[in-house]
């Protein structure tokens, strides 16, 4: 409990799940989610770019080894699933995997650490400090990523199959008879929309739930330490797994978009 | 869930990051990895080749060694034969030389003996004449009686 006895558990959790927001309604921006997201993206690109600049095919340094392990892992995943030629898929998968991994990792930061740091540095009262540091526990972030993937799915579907081919794919299956084409279209549209929705909601749901449990654990007093440790250890599985699933499904969806029936 | 401009901001960041990654991050790293993989593959292939070469060289060396042994044995054989031949030849020559020397010796001895005998015979003739002169106590005309003397000499 951070803000003293005046807060009930519900108020404490609600407070911690509120974003640092500027603007109103649709035009609002979550500064904490977007800020951490961009910061972590820049961390990823800075590290990888510094390795890329000095990349040698000779004996690699330790950082290059680590980066090459990640790149090799992503490259293997892409090559095992996507068989076409596309210069975008692999770097896209790398960005998704590492970026989401870093964003998910913010789940390990103790829930009260950042608000207290801000309180300590700026002197703002804790009740006014809103800081939700896990970007992937914000649906805006996960839907932003999923929307990007969705646009790519549509783009490559049309690019590879043409508008006609894409429409044909949406209408002529699973039922072959012309009278059922509208039904097909509805089914296929739902399938198509389910892809980005499931991508975004799966990631968001896992991380939001994880964050919520961390907050619940933070309200139980002194026993929170071992419980917190257990839950954090469990996230050793959840965090990379969710990043991997998002990347893998992106590759699968794009690979489906490239398949011409 | 309130969906707002954060989503658009995230989408823009996503696009920018992916483009940056595609242009400046992925190609150099994957290039270095693939280049190294090629180098390692080449190195492994080269070591395989070298091992094969070594095996071949060893086989060749063994074969050459065997051949050399056979050759050496045949050379020794030939040398032994040659030696035996030389010994035989030399022995033959020595025998011939010995016989030749013996023959010469015999011939010389024979000549010497004949000569000595001739001299002896002449001396005996002279002694016989001298004895006859003494017996007859008169001088015998050597010229008148030379035919008798010659006959005597021939009889000796």
Swiss-Prot record, chain A:
Membrane-crossing segments per the record: 28-48, 89-109, 140-160, 203-223, 229-249
UniProt xrefs under InterPro entries: ATP_syn_F0_a_bact/chloroplast, ATP_synth_F0_asu, ATP_synth_F0_asu_AS, F0_ATP_A_sf
Assigned keywords, A-Z: ATP synthesis, Cell inner membrane, Cell membrane, CF(0), Hydrogen ion transport, Ion transport, Membrane, Transmembrane, Transmembrane helix, Transport
GO cellular component: plasma membrane; proton-transporting ATP synthase complex
Protein's membrane topology: Multi-pass membrane protein
Pfam families referenced in this protein's UniProt entry, alphabetically: ATP-synt_A (PF00119)
CDD domains, alphabetized: ATP-synt_Fo_a_6 (cd00310)
Places the protein is found: Cell inner membrane
Gene Ontology biological process terms, A to Z: proton motive force-driven plasma membrane ATP synthesis
Primary localisation category: membrane
Taxonomic superkingdom: Bacteria
The keyword Cell inner membrane is assigned to this record: yes
KW Iron-sulfur (keyword) present: no
GO MF annotation terms: proton-transporting ATP synthase activity, rotational mechanism
Assembly behavior: F-type ATPases have 2 components, CF(1) - the catalytic core - and CF(0) - the membrane proton channel. CF(1) has five subunits: alpha(3), beta(3), gamma(1), delta(1), epsilon(1). CF(0) has three main subunits: a(1), b(2) and c(9-12). The alpha and beta chains form an alternating ring which encloses part of the gamma chain. CF(1) is attached to CF(0) by a central stalk formed by the gamma and epsilon chains, while a peripheral stalk is formed by the delta and b chains.
Protein role: Key component of the proton channel; it plays a direct role in the translocation of protons across the membrane.
Annotated family: Belongs to the ATPase A chain family.
Protein name per the record: ATP synthase subunit a
Biological source species: Colwellia psychrerythraea (strain 34H / ATCC BAA-681) (Vibrio psychroerythus)
